[in-house]
């Protein structure tokens, strides 16, 4: 169905020397990690405080138990494994094609797949 597009992308990768990947939630949702903003994402769930408040420094100082409970329940996915996208990006880095991964994901799956130059930027 997308053979032509995949072939075009492969040609671009083959001809490139310094690729930077910009990614977000779509990469990790394939590893069963929920995103933040979809209809059933983290920001749509019901809590006494918003996720932004709960993960803030001031909330942590005032309520460390609540912070850790939320973090453990909603931010840690110990069973998640890198998927094909994570693995392919690590392979491209190892081959010297990929210079950096810039991601909004804070799940560590790019690093678990073997990528070394990962910038996690969320917020």
Question: Each PLM stretch: what is its role?
Answer:
Residues 1-123:
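Conserved catalytic core of sirtuin-type NAD+-dependent deacylases
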